[in-house]
From Swiss-Prot:
Its main location: cytoplasm. PROSITE patterns: CLP_R (PS51903), CLPAB_1 (PS00870), CLPAB_2 (PS00871). This is Chaperone protein ClpB. It comes from Chlamydia pneumoniae. It is found in: Cytoplasm. The Clp repeat (R) domain probably functions as a substrate-discriminating domain, recruiting aggregated proteins to the ClpB hexamer and/or stabilizing bound proteins. The NBD2 domain is responsible for oligomerization, whereas the NBD1 domain stabilizes the hexamer probably in an ATP-dependent manner. The movement of the coiled-coil domain is essential for ClpB ability to rescue proteins from an aggregated state, probably by pulling apart large aggregated proteins, which are bound between the coiled-coils motifs of adjacent ClpB subunits in the functional hexamer.
Length: 866
């Protein structure tokens, strides 16, 4: 029985299937040839590519030849190998024997085809102008002395080409982005690579700081010759772990593939450098039932210095995987890649701007680059520069690109208006009213005018699109010219360099300037093709849910009147409103301590005076919705073990993977108002967890991950000292000061809270009991809310002073604050109106007024002024 390699066995099976599906009686050499050509990873296909043949041309010719084969019209077909195929396989077996191989592989079949003179292969062979002897020499060169001694041996040839990407080739073709501002790290990498032994740099840094970019920067320097003499002419390859592992079905197959890559690198006499991204994935890869993992295969070559390797991994993975394997760790030289500063990140973005402008066909302003860095640094704390800033620029540019391809809003609105007018015109025609003709004529005039306006808008839109499209094409041409200039300079074609640098490139740059000027001078622009800071803010807002763009639109004015905005909802608490407003203003302009939370407040006071309401009002004002407030009822945290609810369970306990309610809430929404309700009810061990949060703005969860709390506002509420506070306020009346109130409450507070906990609170804010005047204001606020809800049903609600007086007198209770008032309004007003709505006494498009009749609350309909 013949021994075939896996690739040839697969090709023979495909050939039989192809003959059967095509209703052919014989499996011919052309069926096999087509099956071999379809496997682009096979040795057969790779050799054809190496001789600069055109596989596509041969594929077409073979399909054409097979279409002329005789077919069976009816019944099932069981195709048999043709005599030609049997001869071909015998010839391939002879070639294998000549080369000393046990298995017939793709290169043996290619040699057999070459000597067979079968059509259409023979005609295609003539186009390559390669002799049988040249082909055999090429195969010997590719094999590098290896033998076909296993079914999978064929997949191990040309390991570099199969399982690696040539970064220097990509750099030469201009497919890599420019690398800006990493000169020191690239120099350090070159220095380590130039060592005699252990010449293997390990790039260690957080995700997104630019480790892969350093490898790309080295590739760019290699093609420019900007490296020491010892590295000139070397090729940099990046190992594709996915390709290496994919399809390795049998034990040992993965190791064979990796060994083939290492053998190719070592046989290159130091001309090849391998870059392994996420190098920690090699530790343990392929190790099953005592088999060696990939890292152990690398160690001997790394130690000898015959393998030049650059690794890249994050600090966490380095500690978790590489440091544990001391033998592997000592073979690499660590190079720490830090996150760039804000200035360096802007510098990097400037270098990449042109690439993104050309790709998206937009313009990116300097302000957009600065905003991308600053806003990503401030509002996306769990990712790293420059990656997060680049992502912002990319997404903002793609948003503009999408808008350019969509119908502009003014045209869309006019088209909708036109459609509505045409529908109305048809309705008038059907009515045939006395004034029908007059109305129809007037309608037609409006339609004609609108159509004319639409035609003008569409013409302007088309012109703008043409200008923008033309600009994109010219910028693409400019990039191609600059790349051609660099290429010509590398090969010392100075005539071409001079032509491009001093003639063609300046001319095209001038044309681009003129087109941009004519685009900017257009009146009533329909398309925006500029990425600015407002758009970047919009993208940040979409990502994080934080209304960042409001700050750019002049939120400063709003912040100056923050007290007034809060007092519309929280009545009678001037101390708390003023202190919280000052803290938020300082945070918004960036003058607060960046290493601490935005604010840590303790609201002290009796029930129903507005402590929770102020927290809700802050969330609404800062983030446009009350849901941005994360609330924790501390009566649920009265046991020591309830700490795990906040930060997550420790390893080995149930719920470890779920995370904690506080840590996960702040990880998902770092900009939040966090409310700890009734803080005195929590266990002291639970409060100790908050010490680190309030002091450093950091929370360490059950998985030892650091959660950034620096952008959250922490509010605690408590009823501690409420009797003393109420008693003091009733005695002093209106002569109250914050310091005096705190002097009364502090002794009681110290019995519940530890000194170190109290020391980390920014401000303790007393909430005083509500007066009758405060209750009157609260009644007005509550009634306006009810009126707002009715307005959505097209019902206008009003009330007279007697209603306010009645509700404030009935709902006032100094011990319980405003909560009894809310219940009273629910019973007296909401229930009254809901019954009337259900009975049909109140209908949409009506106005009603609440008033008092013999100590009873009633409503009456009011005529709406015409």
């Amino acid at each position: 029985m013949e021994k075939f390699s896996d690739a040839v066995s697969e090709a023979l099976e495909k050939a039989f299937e192809l003959a059967k599906s095509s209703k052919h009686t014989y499996v011919t050499e052309n069926h096999l040839l087509l099956a071999l050509l379809e496997n682009t990873e096979s040795l057969f296909y790779l050799v054809i590519k190496d001789i600069h043949g055109n596989p596509g041309l041969l594929n077409t010719a073979v399909k054409d030849a097979l279409s002329r084969e005789p077919t069976v019209v009816e019944g099932e077909v069981d195709p048999k190998p043709s005599p030609g195929l049997q001869t071909l396989l015998r010839d391939a077996k002879q070639e294998a024997k000549t080369l000393g191989d046990e298995y017939i592989s793709g290169d043996h079949l290619l040699l057999a085809f070459w000597s067979s003179n079968k059509e259409p292969f023979n005609s295609w062979k003539q186009t390559t102008k390669v002799s049988f002897k040249d082909l055999k020499n090429l195969i010997t060169k590719i094999r590098r002395g290896n033998r076909m001694d296993s079914p999978s041996a064929e997949s191990n040839f040309q390991g570099l080409e199969k399982y690696c990407k040539n970064l220097t080739a990509l750099a030469r073709e201009g497919k890599l982005d420019p690398v800006i501002g990493r000169d020191e790290e690239i120099r350090r990498t070159i220095q380590v690579l130039s060592r005699r032994t252990k010449n293997n740099p390990m790039l260690i840094g957080e995700p997104g700081v630019g480790k892969t970019a350093i490898a790309e920067g080295l590739a760019l320097r290699l093609i420019q010759g900007d490296v020491p003499e010892s590295l000139k002419g070397k090729q940099l390859y990046v190992l594709d772990m996915g390709a290496l592992i994919a399809g390795a079905k049998y034990r040992g197959e993965f190791e064979e593939r990796l060994k083939s890559v290492l053998k190719d690198v070592e046989s290159g006499d130091g001309e090849h450098i391998i870059f392994i991204d996420e190098v920690h994935t090699l530790v343990g890869a392929g190790a099953t039932d005592g088999a060696m993992d990939a890292a152990n295969l690398l160690k001997p070559a790394l130690a000898r210095g015959t393998l030049h390797c650059i690794g890249a991994t994050t600090l966490n993975e380095y500690q978790k995987y590489i440091e544990k394997d001391a033998a592997l760790e000592r073979r690499f030289q660590p190079i720490f890649v830090t996150e760039p500063s804000l200035e360096d990140a802007v510098f990097i973005l400037r270098g990449l701007r042109e690439k993104y402008e050309i790709f998206h066909g937009v313009r990116i302003t300097e302000g957009a680059l600065n905003a991308a860095v600053l806003l990503s640094y401030r509002y996306i704390p769990d990712r790293f520069l420059p990656d997060k800033a680049i992502d912002l620029i990319d997404e903002a540019a793609s948003l503009i690109r999408m808008q350019i391809g969509s119908l502009p809003l003014p045209i869309d609105e006019k088209e909708r208006e036109l459609a509505a007018l045409i529908v109305k015109q048809e309705a008038i025609k059907r009515e045939q009213s006395p004034s029908y003709q007059e109305e129809a004529d007037a309608m037609q005039k409006s339609i004609d005018a609108l159509r004319e306006e639409l035609a003008s808008l569409r013409l302007g839109w088309d012109e703008e699109k043409k200008l923008i499209s033309g600009l994109k094409e010219k910028k693409n041409s400019l990039e191609s010219m600059k790349f051609s200039e660099e290429e010509a300079e590398r090969v010392a074609d100075y005539n071409r360099v001079a032509e491009l640098r001093y003639s063609l490139i300046p001319q095209l740059e001038e044309e681009i300037k003129q087109d941009e000027a004519s685009l900017n001078q257009r009146d009533n622009r329909l398309l925006q093709e500029e990425v600015d800071e407002r758009l970047i803010a919009q993208v940040v807002a979409n990502w994080t849910g934080i209304p960042v763009q409001k700050m750019l639109e002049g939120e400063a004015e709003k912040l100056l009147i923050l007290e007034e905005s809060l007092e519309e909802r929280v009545v009678g608490q001037p101390f708390a409103v003023s202190a919280v407003s000052d803290s938020i203003r300082a945070a918004r302009v960036g003058l607060n301590d960046p290493q601490r939370p935005l604010g840590v407040f303790l609201f002290l006071g009796p029930t129903g005076v507005g402590k929770t309401e102020l927290a809700k009002a802050l969330a609404d004002l800062l983030f446009n919705k009350e849901e941005a407030m994360v609330r924790f009822d501390m009566s649920e945290y009265m046991e020591k073990h309830s700490i795990s609810k906040l930060i997550g369970s420790s390893p080995g306990y149930v719920g470890y993977e779920e995370g904690g309610s506080l840590s996960e809430a702040l990880r998902r929404r770092p900009y939040s108002v966090v409310l700890f309700d009734e803080i005195e009810k929590a266990d002291k061990e639970v409060l100790n967890i908050l010490l680190q949060v309030f002091d450093d703005g950091i929370l360490t969860d059950g998985k030892k991950r650091k959660v950034n709390c620096k952008n959250a506002l922490f509010i605690m509420t408590s009823n501690i000292g409420s009797p003393e506070l109420a008693d003091y306020c009733s005695k002093k009346g209106s002569e109250l000061t914050k310091e005096a109130i705190l002097s009364v409450v502090s002794p009681v507070l110290k019995r519940y809270l530890s000194p170190e906990f109290m020391n980390r609170i920014d401000e303790i804010l007393p909430f005083v009991p509500l007066t009758k005047e405060d209750i009157v204001k609260i009644v007005g606020i509550q009634m306006r809310r009810i009126a707002q809800r009715l307005k959505a049903r097209r019902i206008n609600l009003s009330w007279d002073d007697s209603v306010i007086l009645f509700l404030s007198e009935q709902g006032y209770d100094s011990a319980f604050g405003a909560r009894p008032l809310k219940r009273l309004i629910q019973q007296k007003v909401v229930i009254l109106l809901s019954k009337a709505l259900l009975k049909g006494d109140i209908k949409p498009d009506t106005s009603i007024e609440l008033t008092m009749a013999k100590e009873v609350l009633v409503f009456k309909k009011v005529e709406t002024p015409s």
